[in-house]
Amino acid sequence: MIHTTRLLWFAAGFTVSQRLILLHPAHANDTALLAHERTHQEQMARVGTLTFWWRYLTDKAFRQQAEVEAYKVQIAHGANRDTCAGWLAGNYWLGIDFATAYALLQD
């Protein structure tokens, strides 16, 4: 894991590969965010890193599934569901509104 401020304007963390997570220093102790990013590492381990990134960037349904899984883990580690739904609805080019994102994040 590397702590860096060189992330996209909306990102607190970013999983590059199965072995590399970038976290903004302001979130260095955010265990819920780290659990979210580790979920992406597990997803990469399941399908392969290159396959993960190809599908994540080209397949909206795959991207949504990957983020919903990761946000559910983040919520289970104490993150606020409203906050996570806002991020899910607004930052992944999924074409969903807050209510839809919130519903996707319910158990």
Which ranges hold each PLM region?
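Long, well-structured alpha-helical subdomains associated
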Residues: 78-107
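Post-HEXXH active-site segment of zinc metalloproteases
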Residues: 6-22, 27-32, 43-74, 82-88
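Juxtamembrane/interface helices at transmembrane-helix boundaries
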Residues: 1-5
